[in-house]
């Protein structure tokens, strides 16, 4: 079975509500998101369809569960939370459009999402212009919350950064798995994957036997994997999303490659195992900000129980971070 390299223990869940106290100096749009009406309007900008819909759907579930609990408890300062949801279709341009619509047309007070770094980067430009805060549960690209002028005033996250994942993968492979020689195989079309790969190269103490890339949407990895098969190495480090890495893992195992495979939080969905095949997902390790294999607080245990009751499935990292 695959194993999680857990970085964050869910000892306590907190529902975070962000309201901008003032407008950014570069506000150029007619957003009224700082004005609270009869309800507190929370925009949800998520990947509900498209390539990485599994992330967005899990986060939407976590958000809905949190809002239901808050509203049943009386809301915030006596006001109920109201969700306004947009599907960004796993497309960066659509993520920007969704944020614009939520801020300008729907006049939300804050936006949760998107889930993926590229979509967050696009959507965050809208928040910086309108002053409507954006909170991403899982956008890990290092520069999402900072720019040349320092920390962005209206962009927040509840997860770790790509550079941290790269450090963890470098340390875990070398120290825990005793992998002194690795193959580095990553998605060159993804800033997320490239950021993790770059940090891994800076931090890894062993030898990178070969470095190769694939692109989002690829389906056939036989050529690269066949080359890897005859090399002398201890593990494959594979930054990318489950949409590709699940397929790569299956094809690698089918070719007889049984070396450990390590990846980032992009592996952290049941779809990875579905694409790889359950028997092929053994000796696989990935970074996660969530695990049930640690001591949990009453709040965390309550979340898991409530999530199972509401959705008839276990929550994953993305659901937990959004909650």
For the regions a language model picked out, list residue spans one by one.
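C-terminal motif of bacterial Sec signal peptides marking the signal peptidase cleavage site
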Residues: 17-20
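Hydrophobic alpha-helical segments within soluble ligand-binding/sensing domains
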Residues: 95, 157-181, 194, 220-222, ...
């Amino acid at each position: 079975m695959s194993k999680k390299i857990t970085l964050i223990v869910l000892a306590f869940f907190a529902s975070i509500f962000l309201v901008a106290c003032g407008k950014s100096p570069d506000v150029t749009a007619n957003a009224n998101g700082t004005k609270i009406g009869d309800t507190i309007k929370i925009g949800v900008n998520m990947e509900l369809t498209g390539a990485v819909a599994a992330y967005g759907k899990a986060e939407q579930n976590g958000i809905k569960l949190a809002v239901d609990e808050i509203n049943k408890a009386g809301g915030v300062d006596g006001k109920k939370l109201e969700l306004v949801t947009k599907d960004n279709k796993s497309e960066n341009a659509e993520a920007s459009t969704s944020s614009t619509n939520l801020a300008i047309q729907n006049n939300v007070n804050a936006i949760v999402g998107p889930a993926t770094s590229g979509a967050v980067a696009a959507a965050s430009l809208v928040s910086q212009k309108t002053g409507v805060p954006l909170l991403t549960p899982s956008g890990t690209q290092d520069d999402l919350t900072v720019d040349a002028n320092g920390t962005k005033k209206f962009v927040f996250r509840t997860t770790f950064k790509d550079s941290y994942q790269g450090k963890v993968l470098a340390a875990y492979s070398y120290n825990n798995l005793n992998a002194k020689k690795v193959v580095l195989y990553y998605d060159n079309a993804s800033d997320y994957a490239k950021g993790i790969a770059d940090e891994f190269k800076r931090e890894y103490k062993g030898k990178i036997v070969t470095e190769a890339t694939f692109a989002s949407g690829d389906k056939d990895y036989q050529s690269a994997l066949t080359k890897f098969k005859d090399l002398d190495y201890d593990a494959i480090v594979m930054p990318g999303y489950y949409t590709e890495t699940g397929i790569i893992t299956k094809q690698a195992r089918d070719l007889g490659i049984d070396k450990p495979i390590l990846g980032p939080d992009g592996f952290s969905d049941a779809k990875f195992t579905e694409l790889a095949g359950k028997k092929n997902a053994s000796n696989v390790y990935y970074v996660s900000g969530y695990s049930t294999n640690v001591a949990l607080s009453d709040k965390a245990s309550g979340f898991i129980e409530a999530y199972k009751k509401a959705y008839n499935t276990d929550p994953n990292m993305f659901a937990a971070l959004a909650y």
